[in-house]
Amino acid sequence: MAENLACGETSESWIIDNDDDDINYGGGFTNEIDYNHQLFAKDDNFGGNGSIPMMGSSSSSLSEDRIKEMLVREIEFCPGTDYVKRLLSGDLDLSVRNQALDWILKVCAHYHFGHLCICLSMNYLDRFLTSYELPKDKDWAAQLLAVSCLSLASKMEETDVPHIVDLQVEDPKFVFEAKTIKRMELLVVTTLNWRLQALTPFSFIDYFVDKISGHVSENLIYRSSRFILNTTKAIEFLDFRPSEIAAAAAVSVSISGETECIDEEKALSSLIYVKQERVKRCLNLMRSLTGEENVRGTSLSQEQARVAVRAVPASPVGVLEATCLSYRSEERTVESCTNSSQSSPDNNNNNNNSNKRRRKQ
């Protein structure tokens, strides 16, 4: 049963004040933020037009100098170096991240949001939790953060974005008013220093696939995307840079090959701008999580095969989220990742619960 939290009920909290005059209730902070795939305000300029290459652009459009610049800048969009250690030690509540990711995946599948929207949402959430501690006595704070991160990511990446309140589907425990979400959005963007068009593994995947395989195809990108999306679940991947995850994903699909297999050592040797040993460690972690056969592309589980069949019709982007969702926590994981695996979502009672929401007075 979801609780609808009105703005006034949280007036004593860190996120709300009583002056709502400065809130834009329409499309966000439109005077300060351009949601058309441009960098946010402040001083976060990147290159000539301020944009950062995202997945889908031709790898030939990225010069070697541009790639080098991206490799230097990517660390600015990573969580703190002690973030994973704090999650594993209990200093930060791992369940906050797990629950947020579970809900974000379900909402992205519901609205057919793209793979990059998932990646950006979690990038914002992880970077925020690095710098800002949520109040432990507010059960709703984690859900509000998840809604705000997804809202910001969808405005950055999607062309058809539902109203901010309508994002709260898939039976969330709490439901928030628009002005409450917008205040949290403002806290997120200021905490992240307005740097929201982040460099992610998807920013590099075309380049590395082309570098290793000599060409970029939809099939190679699709298969690489599966591995990248799956890395969002295991927090150990947060110790790797986005470029290293992208390189490992590119190697994993190239060594199975579309027409001929590329030797793993040969594939790794073609990676001149990243540390090959770290890429190999990342690749081995992918194998541990999903199984040697899946990383080598030689077989798929029954569930993965079922999802792959659904890739043929209308929405290939939506299938990527479904593929990510197909990796359940019961699949083989490395021992150290046990606590970061997700329970599979249970949607059986969604329709029954959707009409049970009440407003908390």
Curated annotation (Swiss-Prot):
Q: Which InterPro entries match?
A: Cyclin, Cyclin-like_dom, Cyclin-like_sf, Cyclin_C-dom, Cyclin_N, Cyclins_cyclin-box
Where do the record's region annotations for Disordered lie?
A: 335-361
Tissue specificity note: Expressed in roots and leaves.
Q: Which Pfam families does the record cross-reference, listed alphabetically? A: Cyclin_C, Cyclin_N
Q: Does the keyword Cell cycle apply?
A: yes
What Gene Ontology biological process does one annotation of this record name? Answer: cell division
Listed A to Z, the keywords are:
Cell cycle, Cell division, Cyclin
- Low complexity bias: start-end ranges: 339-354
Induction (free text): By sucrose and glucose.
Q: Give the quaternary structure.
A: Interacts with KRP1/ICK1 and with the C-terminal domain of CDKA-1.
Per the entry, what this protein does is: Acts on the G1 phase of the cell cycle to control cell division rate in both shoot and root meristems. The complex formed with CDKA-1 phosphorylates plant retinoblastoma protein.
* Family membership noted in the UniProt record: Belongs to the cyclin family. Cyclin D subfamily.
What's the protein here called?
Answer: Cyclin-D2-1
Q: What's the encoding gene here?
A: CYCD2-1
